[in-house]
Amino acid sequence: MLKKQKIIIIVFVALFVVLTILYFAVIAPLTKDDGEETTEPVETDVGESRTPQNYWLIFPQVEREDIKSIEVHNKYGTYKFYRNKEDKFVIEGFENLAYDQEQFSQLVVSTGFTISQVKVTENPTEEQLKEYGFYDDPAYYILTTKSGTVHKVIIGYKIIAGGGYYAMYEGRKTIYVLEKSLEKVVLAPVVDMVAPLVTAGIKSNEYFNIDNFKIYHHDKLFFAAQNLTSEELKERETTALVASKVTHPGDYTPSNIYDEVRLGLVNYVGDAVVALGLTEENLKEYGLSDPPYTITYNYKDDSYKLIASEPVDGYYYVGTYLFNTIVKVPEEDFKFLSWSLLKWIDNSAFQRSITFVASIKVETPQFTETFRLTHLDKSSNPNLIVKGDLCGVIDGSDEVYNFRQFYKSLLTVQIEGEAPLTDEEKAELIANDKRCILKFTVTTLGGNVTEYGFYRYSTRRCLLTVNGVGQFYVVIDVPRKIAGSAQKVIKGETIDPQEKY
């Protein structure tokens, strides 16, 4: 019996020791009051919230699909993106302007997800507001939701460490710190988000439909060209290099460079947009108040207009009326603006297929003759009869062949360069009949009439005029050869293509 009692006592002692250890090791620390305050949940201002990482959200996150508009004001100006009737975001006042979608997505994130790791202060003093940059027209943005909720956040100075910006929510006296990433969108000029398009809306395989192309130097027309009509195209089908004609400074054929320029203008993109709006202020800043260069053209039913500055540090500044912007363009891409007229004109001054010629009038100081052409057969081997006031009827194969040699001499008129004459000197020269070596006038079956004149101004050169307008010169041998060949036709003499005059 005694032994059994000892065992029970030992068990109770062991249990007491275990319970004592458990009390001091576990329970006592949990109930101990050491005088320290317990941690309470952090209070938030109305409209604020906390993220799972315990960061501040200045206002609840707004997703892209819930945004109605975002207005931004910074040192570069004010702009606004809004959702249009097609449910697409556009820039107010520049609705047809393309913009960088990635940049806009960053704007949505920066303005709709306002996360702040810290609150700098609450109820700031006037001195603190100045210190943190909330005076003197600070930057801000206004985000409006589809439901009509408006959030306005004001941006202050960059924090000393450079990792963010001080910010305040309008109507709330609390200063936060927002992430540095907002400087790339909210604090940047809107032009950084705009695609630097100069032209658009034309398919590259339809560049040849660009028509009524003109270049002005200041307000003076420098070069103009237009597409040939179907009738004109037939007249030049065997000789024309391009399906266009120059209309200024005269009726010439454009060089192949004209097509290259038209192709280059299709959907052209520059380096950067430097200004939105062709305002007087912007035009003055980029040398466009009195634009040195103006380009106009049509494409189907649309009209296009570009203005360009003089090149500055390797760039042109190009104002585009399509997008109402000024774009920085590499000088190399628009070098055609500085080209001389000669580069735009094909050297072959006369390009007509004889098949579509009705008559040729030749005038020299020695004679005047009109050759009237009758085309009996328009197959691949057409027959030709020529009647002249002096030469009579030309219908034999040898005589017709000889006449064709004369016609070939017209096709040899080659422009050599621009005549070094002033407008006054040209006018005086053209008015002097004694200086005219030759004129020939071609009338087509379609009724088009073109007169070519050759006026000697030096021992080796003649001013070439087309319908009375002169710009280029040819060597004097050219009109002499044409006149000599015409005279041989009149006299019935054989033309030697190699003969010099």
Q: What role is predicted for each listed range?
A:
Residues L2-Y501:
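Soluble, acidic/polar mature domains that operate outside membranes
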